[in-house]
Amino acid sequence: MDLMELLKQAQRLTNETNTDTEVPGVERTMSQVLQATKEFHSRVTQMGTNDLQAHILLGSKGVDLPKLTQKLESLSARQTFEPIDPVTETNVQAYLKNERENAILSVIDETNRSIFKSVERQKWRCIYSEWGEEKEALLNALVGPNQQDFPDVQFQIVPTAMADEPTPYSQLNGHEQMYAEQIAIHNQSIILGRRPNLLSTLAHVVQDSFNDESVAEMWNVLQFMTALPPVSSTIDPIKNRQTSPQFVEQARTYLERRYRTYMRKFIVANLAKARRGGIPSVYHMVRSYVGVTLQGQRALYGLHDVNNGQPLWPHVYYSLRSGDMDAAALYLKESGTCPDLLTLLTLRKNGDRDNLMVKLEGQLKLEYNSRLRACTDPYKKAVYVVLLACDPHFTHVELMRSIDDFLWMQLSILRRSDQSDSNTEQLTFSGLQSLILEKYGENYFNAREKAALYFQVLTLTGQFEAAIEFLARTEKNRTHAIHMAIALNEISMLGTPRSVEQSLLSSDPDDPKPMKRLNLVRLIVMYTKCFERTDTTQALHYYYLLRNFKSENGRGNVMLTCVCDLLVEKCDDEMLELIFGTEDKKNGLRYGGIYAEFQIHECDKYSLAEMVGDELSKRGDYELAIELYFIGGQLDKALRLVNSLLAQVVHQPTQNGSVRNRLGDIINRLDAALVVRKSDVEVQVVVTYTVLTKVMKFFDHYHEGALRSALEILTNNHLIPASSLEVDECVTNIKRMGPEVIKVLPDILLASMDIVYQEYVKLMDSNETASGFFDESKCVNKEPAVKHLRDRAKAFTNMAASVPYRMPSTTNQRLVQLEILMH
């Protein structure tokens, strides 16, 4: 191919590649074409280099490459011994656990749904029932006594909301009213100089009037535990309770008496088996009881020693459990066994504690530790433990049939600190209290459902405060708990904190653990707040019980603080008449009132009224505070508040029901009182009050349009100057007055300037001489009168600039503006 043919082919190819689009052609140089060729060549050689080398290598060795490729594709990388499909391991225990939990959850969920549906149905049933009763009551109220008035209405008589004999509204229920009546009677006795036992009184009322055995039992145990010789109010109840063995003896005696009652009832229920006989006594009762309870060989298995054909130690134990040491000693004497134990029992019964008794206790403890710890007779072990006060951690499971048995056993092995033996482990009163309150607690005794039981356990262990606080948590028992606390405090057996601001139940660092102190003030105040507005008389009787507690805010005792707070919250005429008595219109004094019946020497009703007035004054309720100051005879404080109120509203026009209008009645009462008791008030206060009342009259005349009378009042009292010559005199007079007068001075100057300006306008619009309230000798014609008015206006502006008080900018602007308008 020559060069011409090659050129023709190139042109033909060029023509074929040309398109109709107007895309510009790309021209490359030879160097660019060479570079692009190298790039394409490098890409092709890199992609195929590895495969080509592999083919060359294997082909030279005689390997059939296509077959090799097929074999490689058929190979699998997985191990032949593993299954192709993954199989998870079977965990039977986890599967069963999961199924069991799912079943439990499904049951719980189903139960919840059924309970919710049941509650929902019950709720709507009750709602529909209440709606039906309301509709019947409304229809019954609409339908009159004559059926002829509504012939088409069918009705039946149902109980209406109103009683046949309406009674006064009260927040107290029947039980609370009974308690409140007894509190009022008790307070009256205290006022008359008598001091009855409130706890015994309330216990008898509950027994006779309340149809609740659990509440009566709680009062009975509290009454029994406090049936001790009275103690002085100066002795701390907590320390006395912890150091005196009488409380432990009382608790044990209570449990022993209750057990004797149980034994009698048990024997009466089994008279055929009991075979009672002989003289009625604990000795024969125990014999009958043991004869019924321990029948058959199985019941007698493991018991030691026999007396008259019956086991000995059950008789001794139940005699001690019944509180009769004589019967226990008689059984031991009849059997002739354990003479040392009989001697110890006799010494313990007689109250002797000498060297012989200490020696016997040591010998018997050695015998117990060496031989009786492994004894199979639980009654014998219990007798030794009770008489020797040892082995406090042994549970005596065979004999503990109730919490009473457990408590009696623990109380029987208690030893005071002065009787403790360092060589043996013994139980103390504080240890038993901690065991009941802290170790076992409410959950162990199921206190939510068995509140009476838990209360009795705490009371029998001397923890009155914790027991009452527990009862006070529930609405059902709160009323009983509060009155139990009141009754204990009245006989000086309730431990109260040092500060009335403490929580309801608190601990004192000086008290032995776990003893608590109950804040009686907080308990009573929370209780009375519910009804103090509707049953004020009853609330005051409860507050009277707090007269011996000191208030933290420095307002005397807590009773005064509570009554003061009550009056501050509700200080209407009815409340004032109830507490302070009826007002005598002649002299303004109040006579009667329930507060006077309490005869509080530290603070009479006048001091109480002053205290309430001070509190109302702090809260900004000045009108009520003034009324209380009137009752308390505090004219000075009443005048100060009246001055403060007058300074705020004296410039306002009079309107019915406004503060300014009500101040008029107060001013009339103050004027009448100042005639008699003006010497009791500071002179400065009286002067300020007098000036403000004059200013009040000035503004009354000003708003009524009596301009002449208004200016005469100010001129006569030298409050504003009549001319420029009197400015200094008026400023000096203002300085001697109280801040209340200075506060109202801008309004006085504005009103006075307005009066002068109105007179100026009237004078300029008239051809007559000046108004009649200017001196006719000075105002013979219009010009002197105008000059006099301008001079007076100038005096007002000068006075506003001279007083030692920063006038409002609007006042100065208005004064200058009116003065300029008069030129």
UniProtKB/Swiss-Prot annotation:
Compartment list: Nucleus membrane; Nucleus, Nuclear pore complex; Nucleus, Nucleoplasm
Entry annotated with the keyword Membrane: yes
Stored InterPro entries: Nucleoporin_int_Nup93/Nic96 (IPR007231)
Gene Ontology CC annotation, any one: nuclear pore
Record GO terms (molecular function): chromatin binding; chromatin DNA binding; structural constituent of nuclear pore
GO BP of this protein: chromosome attachment to the nuclear envelope; negative regulation of gene expression, epigenetic; nuclear pore organization; oocyte karyosome formation; poly(A)+ mRNA export from nucleus; protein import into nucleus; protein localization to nuclear inner membrane; regulation of nucleus size
Primary localisation category: nucleus
Record note on disruption phenotype: RNAi-mediated knockdown in oocytes and nurse cells results in irregular distribution of chromatin to the nuclear periphery, leading to disrupted karyosome morphology. RNAi-mediated knockdown in the wing disk results in de-repression of genes silenced by the Polycomb group proteins complexes such Abd-B.
Keywords noted in UniProt: Chromatin regulator, Membrane, mRNA transport, Nuclear pore complex, Nucleus, Protein transport, Translocation, Transport
Keyword Protein transport among UniProt keywords: yes
Oligomeric and partner information: Part of the nuclear pore complex (NPC). Interacts with msk (via C-terminus); this association might be facilitated by Nup75. Interacts with Mad (preferentially when phosphorylated). Interacts with Nup154 (via N-terminus). Interacts with the Polycomb group (PcG) proteins Pc and E(z).
UniProt family annotation: Belongs to the nucleoporin interacting component (NIC) family.
Record function comment: Required for nuclear pore complex assembly, maintenance and function. Required for nuclear import of phosphorylated Mad via importin msk. Has no role in classical nuclear localization signal (cNLS)-dependent nuclear import via importin-beta. Mediates the association between the nuclear pore complex and a subclass of silenced regions bound by Polycomb group (PcG) proteins, enables long-range interactions between Polycomb loci and contributes to repression of polycomb targets.
Name the UniProt record assigns to this protein: Nuclear pore complex protein Nup93-1
Species whose genome carries this gene: Drosophila melanogaster
